[in-house]
Amino acid sequence: MKTGDNMKEHPSRLELRERIVDTALQSFVTHGIKSITMDDIAAALGISKRTLYEVFADKETLLMECLRRAQDEGDTYVKEVYEKASNVLEVLLKLYQRSIEKFHNTNKKFFEDIKKYPKVYDMLIKRRNRDSEETIAFFKLGIKQGYFRDDVNFSIVNLLVREQLYLLMNTDLCKEYSFLEVYESIMFTYLRGISTEKGARKLEEFIQEYRQKRQASSE
């Protein structure tokens, strides 16, 4: 009986690790990283700070695991969308829609704070470079399918958009306009510029439907 009670009171280390990552990731995204302490996370989970430090040695290690979790979820989503989509533009539009939703629900301080953690920031840069290569491969497939122009240097365009997004995360632009509004303007202008007539028609259908859904959800 005691053994059973102990198992209920003390979940496995793996289960505890998952709970910690879930709670920490949600807290970091909602409030920013700097404002959330290890004490806050322990309190939210109802565990001691000592127990938390037994699982994660420090805040940066925990943050890195949180980002790995988010990246794994993103990879799974890409795979699912790719398997169901009928063309590459549909894949990209769904991915951008997910990005918009993620940015909308993320505190801007999260992006500002991440630079204070060198190991985590370095991991993000490496991941960003890998994602860029995959994005360019998508665009090349889109050319073959007739959705994107074949006279565009996608390596340059992708770099420019990436730098625009980096700038967005590190300026006061969002004090005048909402983060979501600026992000949408960048992405939709970008996609319009690289699309063929066929791609542009598909894109405008998506934008119209997306904005109708967003308006309906805000009413």
Residue ranges with predicted function:
Residues 16, 59, 66, 70, ...:
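Hydrophobic/aromatic residues within well-ordered alpha-helical segments
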Residues 81, 97-101, 110-113, 188-194:
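Helix-loop "lid/cap" segments that line or gate small-molecule binding pockets
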Residues 65, 76-105, 158-161:
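Hydrophobic alpha-helical connector segments
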Residues 46-56:
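Short hydrophobic/aromatic patch on the recognition helix
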Residues 1-5, 137, 141, 145, ...:
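C-terminal peripheral helix-coil segments that are non-catalytic and often amphipathic
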Residues 90, 127, 144-160, 174-184:
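All-alpha amphipathic helical-bundle segments outside canonical DNA-binding/catalytic cores
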Residues 1-31, 35-47, 61-64:
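Basic, helix-initiating cap at the start of DNA-binding domains
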Residues 101-156:
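Short secondary-structure transition hinges
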